[in-house]
């Protein structure tokens, strides 16, 4: 017998995988969580530009326009666009009356 075989034998007997065909709820829950984590990580790496762009721009929406007439909305959009077009390198503050 080689030294390698003598060292491996007790480890294989003591620490062998005992979770094959296991119906232990903790093992099942850990497996499901692990698989979901792997799937979410893969999706995050594949679509991270789309996901983070959505959150970045989605959370920076302007004020609510509910109840505001369409003419005032259009005027506000034009003022915003003119401010952006006027100077792209400096911050422009628009005060609404």
UniProtKB/Swiss-Prot annotation:
Extra remark: When the channel is activated, one or more imidazole moieties of His-37 probably become bi-protonated.
Which segments carry the region annotation Disordered? 60-88
Residue ranges crossing the lipid bilayer per the database entry: 23-43
Q: What residues bear Phosphoserine in this entry? A: 64, 93
One GO cellular-component annotation of the UniProt record comes to: membrane
Site entry: Seems to be involved in pH gating: 41
Q: Topological domain, Virion surface: which ranges?
A: 1-22
Instruction: List locations, semicolon-separated.
Output: Virion membrane; Host apical cell membrane
Which of the residues are on side Intravirion? 44-97
Q: In UniProt terms, what function does this protein have?
A: Forms a proton-selective ion channel that is necessary for the efficient release of the viral genome during virus entry. After attaching to the cell surface, the virion enters the cell by endocytosis. Acidification of the endosome triggers M2 ion channel activity.
Q: What is this protein called?
A: Matrix protein 2
Lipoprotein listed as a keyword? yes
Q: InterPro entries, alphabetically? A: Flu_M2
Q: How does it sit in the membrane?
A: Single-pass type III membrane protein
Instruction: Work out whether the entry's keyword set contains Iron-sulfur.
Output: no
For this chain, the family text in UniProt reads:
Belongs to the influenza viruses matrix protein M2 family.
Q: What is known of its domains?
A: Cytoplasmic tail plays an important role in virion assembly and morphogenesis.
Amino acid composition bias (Basic and acidic residues), ranges on this chain? 71-80
